[in-house]
Amino acid sequence: MIQITVVQIDNYGPWTVTPNPRRESDLQALQSRLYCDMNLQFGAHRGLAFYTRFDNIIAITNGIDLETHKRIQNSVKNRYPFTVSMAVASAETAYGAQKLATKTIQEYGSAQDDVRKEVLDVANEFVSNGYVQLAHVDINDITGKLTDLETAYDTYLSVQKTKLKLMEELKKYDSLGFFIGGDNFMCPCNGMSEKDFLCMFEDIKESCGIELKAGIGIGKTAEDASDLADIGLEVIREGKTDFQVYTLKQDVEERKDVTYNYMCPI
């Protein structure tokens, strides 16, 4: 089981234009700061957050309890000109968990409802013995094939096309995909096999002309899984395997449960 938290800014759209439209550079900086904070605060408890649309953030939160969520929510209220609502859900797949979390938060009203404020709800249960599977995907030789040859914008466009195709293919497996900078994507993919990734990469190569590779990490928390995925990708980059997908799995005895009672200082 994987645990997902959906974080949504309360009544954000109307706030950005009340009493008058706010300066765009300030809004962009504010959204970026919230994303940074969510990664620092969930990350302090071995979670991992993805910006999606910035006003909606998806976090992998295996091992993070309700009290910690509440403290993060209060921290936002104390330091930002808006509040956030959160819904937590767990499922066998990442897509299933975020779907349930999204439905839970939607039951409290519209994202632009000025009455709905600081929702914090759990759709089913907190995960105690689940696991997180993450794939760190990147483009083969983007520097030589795109960065050093094409314009910055054309390279960006190629990466975005690849991202969209990757996300669409991952959804077929009830998995998610997020752009994490450069030519890198992080993909919560509980239940997918190496064969699934190889087939998916072949389809993307045929449709986009882009070759991909992936390190897959399986661990108790998002931090554990992402660390292993990063190592797996380095194994491929360094030519230590002939395959374009490499999986590493955490030893179940390697990390004991730790109860966190601190917050990451911002």
Curated annotation (Swiss-Prot):
Family annotation (Pfam families): GCH_III (PF05165)
GO molecular function: GTP binding; GTP cyclohydrolase IIa activity
Biological process, per Gene Ontology: biosynthetic process
Catalytic reaction annotation: GTP + 3 H2O = 2-amino-5-formylamino-6-(5-phospho-D-ribosylamino)pyrimidin-4(3H)-one + 2 phosphate + 2 H(+)
Domain of life of the native organism: Archaea
E.C. no: 3.5.4.29
Family annotation (HAMAP family): GTP_cyclohydro_3
Protein name in the entry: GTP cyclohydrolase III
Gene responsible for this protein: gch3
